[in-house]
Amino acid sequence: MPTVEELYRNYGILADATEQVGQHKDAYQVILDGVKGGTKEKRLAAQFIPKFFKHFPELADSAINAQLDLCEDEDVSIRRQAIKELPQFATGENLPRVADILTQLLQTDDSAEFNLVNNALLSIFKMDAKGTLGGLFSQILQGEDIVRERAIKFLSTKLKTLPDEVLTKEVEELILTESKKVLEDVTGEEFVLFMKILSGLKSLQTVSGRQQLVELVAEQADLEQAFSPSDPDCVDRLLQCTRQAVPLFSKNVHSTRFVTYFCEQVLPNLSTLTTPVEGLDIQLEVLKLLAEMSSFCGDMEKLETNLRKLFDKLLEYMPLPPEEAENGENAGNEEPKLQFSYVECLLYSFHQLGRKLPDFLTAKLNAEKLKDFKIRLQYFARGLQVYIRQLRLALQGKTGEALKTEENKIKVVALKITNNINVLIKDLFHIPPSYKSTVTLSWKPVQKVEIGQKRTSEDTSSGSPPKKSPGGPKRDARQIYNPPSGKYSSNLSNFNYERSLQGK
């Protein structure tokens, strides 16, 4: 093992040789042997090996292996020095190997070391993006779980910081190709991260790019397979995939496949859905997603059939008035309760799809069914008016801090929901029914997004196909209030949210 003095002497030989460095192979071998010495010798070797690496291609493997030994040394200061110098080995055919090594080193728990690895990866990314991606994806596909996890997070956080001259169209195509391989077997959280990566690529910001992403999500959602409402993994996967798809839809990128699947497979099984997460109102969550997608549904093959399924489901939540005895009192039937949150979603979805078949209520339903529907609408509208007046009275004169209390936040949301339902019911009362009114769903930002405008992909905390529990989609901070799913009914029960309307 060489001493410190021998290392300096051989360094001097190489430094003084200028253009004839490659003739002093023995001197470079002495420096390589420095990795077997003590702490001081290793520190010097960590600096000297990369400095002359390019002059000895025949010793490339030995040099990289020597530096890798230092990257795994017990002494953290030696590891840091060795990692810092790794980009100097990233030349030609060695670069993918260096990228592979650096990706493996992401598993370190030392924060300073972790930052060095990140910086080194970014450094070689700028030298050769394709080669670096080769190393990263190699570990994502075949590496240890911790390495895979951190490599994916590296891509999801660092790609967006790279300039356009690094992320060329060819590089983005490689990212898409490799990502598709990974997406064949991913956890929920990984799926969400990859959607974040892909939706951020410049080449996928176009209409055709967004369409590619929607098809990718549809494949993950397994829309060709029958829906299994009792399987929490199946429910979870559909929820998370749909959450990822919703921000991609626009007037040019249609939600038709998803809306069709929801109408045909999910709505008929709504009451038997197994919730994948405790405390989640799974039925309301599904109806919210359907409502958001319905605005961007294109031409549907079985429109009348699916509209009828949606209509039938709406009827379940729009009760008939209770029968009255001769004296005008309740005849003993239980007073119906109005589930406003559900009705907002279903009525909005029906209103959106109904535009595509405007004579559905007048020509496709028989007179008796239409009369029944009008009675239900009228009863619901009567209850709405009572409740809207109560809410407005309760919120009258309240501003600033007063509106920030939990109770008042809930009332504000309830007012948005009931106002939306009121507008939609008025449309359907027209003769013939009208589908012209526009409302903003109660949980969405008040500020409208132009139909053709690009929307930013929503991020989620974790998600599924099919192994992870879902985290709800991140909502826009501009909205007034958005309580967790199911909170409307439970918390507003104290404020007669699901109102009994007998005698009103």
Swiss-Prot record:
Induction: Down-regulated in vascular smooth muscle cells (vSMCs) treated with benzo[a]pyrene (BaP).
Compositionally biased region (Polar residues): 487-504
Gene Ontology cellular component annotations, sorted alphabetically: cytoplasm; nuclear speck; spliceosomal complex
Molecular-function annotations in GO: fibroblast growth factor binding
Phosphothreonine modified-residue sites: T399
Primary location class: nucleus
Superkingdom: Eukaryota
Identification of the protein by name: Apoptosis inhibitor 5
Protein species of origin: Mus musculus (Mouse)
Lineage: Eukaryota, Metazoa, Chordata, Craniata, Vertebrata
Gene name per UniProt: Api5
